Swiss-Prot record:
Biased composition (Polar residues): 48-58
Record protein name field: Protein HEXIM1
Single GO BP term: negative regulation of transcription elongation by RNA polymerase II
Task of the protein: Transcriptional regulator which functions as a general RNA polymerase II transcription inhibitor. Core component of the 7SK RNP complex: in cooperation with 7SK snRNA sequesters P-TEFb in a large inactive 7SK snRNP complex preventing RNA polymerase II phosphorylation and subsequent transcriptional elongation. May also regulate NF-kappa-B, ESR1, NR3C1 and CIITA-dependent transcriptional activity.
Organism for this UniProt entry: Rattus norvegicus
Domain-level remarks: The coiled-coil domain mediates oligomerization.
Expression induction or repression: Up-regulated by HMBA (hexamethylene bisacetamide).
Taxonomic classification: Eukaryota, Metazoa, Chordata, Craniata, Vertebrata
Principal localisation: nucleus
Gene3D superfamilies xref list: 6.10.250.2910
PANTHER family: HEXAMETHYLENE BISACETAMIDE INDUCIBLE 1, PROTEIN HEXIM1
Region described as Autoinhibitory acidic region: spans on this chain: 207-247
Length: 356
């Protein structure tokens, strides 16, 4: 009976010392700067003993030694007299812990864990809190760098496109004029750069022919044509006059023929320029010599035609003189005929009384 009472009497001040040491340790930890707590890692394998790493058995199976080696340094610092308490119990009781020592060690393990666990959790939360605070602005910066803020407003001047078949007649006319001006400008730029260009494919002459007003069939507004033609007017002249009045064989009038002639001349000039650009130096020299020969032939022919025209001009003057002489003789003949008629009438008239 004396031994249990003595052991209980010895336990009371020891537990009080243990709790007091824990309180002092917490006060010291509170006085420590926060930087010291941040330096302590959560889990460090360097504090584990080699025996615990080598042994594959659970803690508590090998006795008190295994438990002491597996405890972290925070637990031993929090309660340094725990090992002394266990040694005192072993020395006072004199019992062998190999058989029944598992239960005290097992009971002591949760106690030590319960004593040390609050401090460990508080340190872990203190370590995690500043790390999260550091990661939050860094993540915001990364998101800002990755995603660009949209600072532009949508433009109010939107181009309202409409298909061609939905345009009105005025809009179609403006669109066609704009396209024709643009095409002519582009063709002029390309031609100035020396690039081959195709003729502007337009159907405006068809539209002009289609838009022509119907002729007014009221005959009262037009002057009547002479019913009879003079003798010197031939049928060919009549056909030519009719063709001119109708606007030509193509039905386009004078403006259409001028447009076609201008288009043909432009196309021929472009084709000729392209052919000269594609020719080599020898071919150009040969072409130049041929053109000189052709020019000399044309000049000779022109001189010959001029001489002939001069001769024909002299013949024409003679013919004109003869025509004038003929007219004069005809007039004189008519005058003689009239005089002869008067003499005949006088001869046929009866003699007067005065003459008898």
């Amino acid at each position: 009976m004396a031994e249990p009472l003595l052991s209980e009497h010895q336990h009371q001040p020891q537990t009080s010392n243990c709790t007091g040491a824990a309180v002092v340790h917490e006060e010291q930890n509170s006085e420590r700067p926060p930087s010291a707590e941040e330096r302590v890692p959560k889990e460090d394998s360097r504090w584990q003993s080699r025996a615990s790493l080598q042994s594959g058995s659970r803690p508590g199976q090998e006795g008190d030694g295994g438990l002491k080696h597996q405890l972290p340094p925070l637990q031993t610092n929090a309660c340094p007299e725990l090992s002394c308490l266990e040694k005192g119990e072993k020395g006072q009781n004199g019992e062998d812990l190999s058989t029944g020592g598992a239960s005290p060690s097992a009971e002591g393990e949760p106690m030590s864990e319960s004593l040390v666990q609050p401090g460990h959790d508080s340190e872990a939360t203190k370590l995690e809190a500043p790390v999260a605070g550091v990661e939050e602005p860094w993540g915001q910066q990364q998101r800002q760098l990755g995603k660009k803020k949209h600072r532009r407003r949508p433009s109010k001047k939107k181009r309202h496109w409409k298909p061609y078949y939905k345009l009105t007649w005025e809009e179609k006319k403006k669109f066609d004029e704009k396209q024709s001006l643009r095409a002519s400008r582009v063709r002029a730029e390309m031609f100035a750069k020396g690039q081959p260009v195709a003729p502007y494919n337009t159907t405006q002459f068809l539209m002009d022919d289609h838009d022509q007003e119907e002729p007014d069939l009221k005959t009262g507004l037009y002057p009547k044509r002479a019913a009879a033609k003079s003798d010197d007017t031939s049928d060919e002249d009549f056909v030519e006059e009719a063709g001119e009045e109708d606007g030509g064989s193509d039905g386009m009038g004078g403006d259409g023929s001028e447009f076609l002639q201008r288009d043909f001349s432009e196309t021929y000039e472009r084709y000729h320029a392209e052919s000269l650009q594609n020719m080599s130096k020898q071919e150009l020299i040969k072409e130049y010599l041929e053109l000189e020969k052709c020019l000399s032939r044309k000049e000779d022919e022109n001189n010959r035609l001029r001489l002939e025209s001069k001769r024909l001009g002299g013949v024409d003057a003679r013919v004109r003189e003869l025509e004038l002489e003929l007219d004069r003789l005809r007039a004189e003949n008519r005058q003689l005929l009239t005089e002869n008629e008067l003499h005949r009438q006088q001869e046929r008239a009866p003699p007067s009384k005065f003459g008898d």
